[in-house]
Amino acid sequence: MMSSARALPADAITMAAVETATGLVASLARRRGKATGLSVLAIGLIAKRLELLHRLVPAAISIALLVNPASAGGAERQKVEAQTAARALEVDLLIVNARSKDEIEAAFVSLATQHVGALLVGAHPVFRTQNDQIVALAARYAIPTSYESTLSTTVGGLMSYGTDLADVSRQLGVYTGRILKGVKPSDLPVMQPTRFNSKTAKALGLEISPDLLAIADGMIE
């Protein structure tokens, strides 16, 4: 979804699915053409999220990826990206499918039975709708879990790497103002906040290292 204003120089701010694979942006830090802004869908960020989760839970020899197979293209892209990242990190990757609230519950029971070391929640509307359920299940089964939205960390999720949906409108206003003042859109990165929940980390017996704290945009106590 693109939005533009006549007052803006021929460049536009993009909101919603900004993904490097589409060619819309060359990278999250440096985009090409006439688009910049905030990425809401985190499909193209699976590899980075897996890396950060592995750094937070280095003892995990197996990490699961939760995807919704109903989204065939999106699920497949996330699986391929995660598999490539897992090989590079030398960790085993387990793909877990869930389409509904009941299937999410069953997925966590399976993960606990298999003693999976950590979980990466893929990008899908069902998982956002069931955010509170997923956070609660991760706590119940003591599975370190990474989420795509910072909304998850505000309700007890361990960590997130993705857009703060509640902050999108404010940040778009900031970007628009900077462009109107003459800043080139090519100098504005696509924003992807990283946040940790220290209370959840302590409950899981995890220590957030100084290097991870250094890249965090926020820490929820």
Model-predicted regions and their roles:
Residues 1-221:
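Short hydrophobic alpha-helices and adjacent helix-cap/hinge residues
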